Amino acid sequence: TVHIPLPLLNQIEEAGFEWQIPGLRRELIIALIKSLPKPVRRNFVPAPNYAEAFLGRAAPLELPLLDSLERELRKMTGVTIDREAWQWDQVPDHLKITFRVVDDKNKKLQEGRSLQALKDALKGKVQETLSAVADDGIEQSGLHIWSFGTLAESYEQKRGNYKVKAWPALVDERDSVAIKLFDNPQEQQQAMWRGLRRLLLLNIPSPIKYLHEKLPNKAKLGLYFNPYGKVLDLIDDCISCGVDKLIDEAGGPVWTEEGFSQLHDKVRAELNDTVVEIAKQVEQILTAVFNINKRLKGRVDMTMALGLSDIKAQMAGLVYRGFVTGNGFRRLGDTLRYLQAIEKRLEKMAIDPHRDRAQMLKVESVQQAWQQWLNKLPPNRREDDDVREIRWMIEELRVSFFAQQLGTPYPISDKRVLQAMEQITP
């Protein structure tokens, strides 16, 4: 059993613990292989031999245990093991690590096999602990200007025999921003970007008037046919996307008053034209959506029903309320291309629905692997750029299958997508 003081819970990573101590590792691998359902398990008989081979090939602690075990067994046999196939409940208890979170008096707060589950369950208490040990003035609210000098990118405070670590960030509170402490750097970065965006918008004139003056009537009309809420919400989405683009161009979030001043001047000077450019692209996207939806209405040929359902699900992931900021400026042109690929697919599907279904099943297989892989990641890891990139690779895979003539920016295949997932560390 691993004892973890509550204030240190956010600093402990699960990776590595599941490998057990070296003396129990072989026994654990054998037990895991034997836990597989019989149709899968028979590919790895005798289990002790495969356990020995795995331990001879794998680099302990380099990857999470199951990631490494699945990868090496697949290399040895060509058999892919679904994550759900492992039956941890059949592994003897003495081979499993237990995590116990304790308070200042060493009293048990909670314990379990999953460190991430404990982090999720005790997140509020960890946050309270961070706020309690923070110096006065670190956390603030109701801010409308950058009036706090330099914002530290990390914060440490000694408590008893250990150091409590937190990550400060600006937090978007709509009419103002706040400074809050986060228990991990991923959430800090995500909050900081949104909070910085809000503080910039609070300190520059709105681009809406300029947008109405400069946007062609056709584009204005396209925005008013927005099926995803009020047009003003869509315009706000375009503005937020524009600020994000300019923050990105400047090198990302800033942490000093001087840096904010320089970024503010850049955004004030360039945001109007940037938002007009974005709104024109959004109008093209919404027009493509409108045209596709027209084709999806009416009687459905049963041979095309599954393909059409797949298209609707794909579109829901591409264009939704908040998609402009959600997808980001760099993806607007890609989003339009993916919609154009859907139009090409509809043309081909009407001619050969069986070929469409065969290609769709290949994409579905990759999507299922991606979803399983995504579910394994800590929640705060799923929004990181390298993780999000996999989703866009699957969109490119669709283009290569259904509308190859449109081209992709790089070579793509189902195998390349799976390899890219393997190379990303949790």
Q: What does each of the following model-derived ranges do?
A:
Residues 1-426:
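A positional "C-terminalness" feature that preferentially activates on distal terminal regions of long
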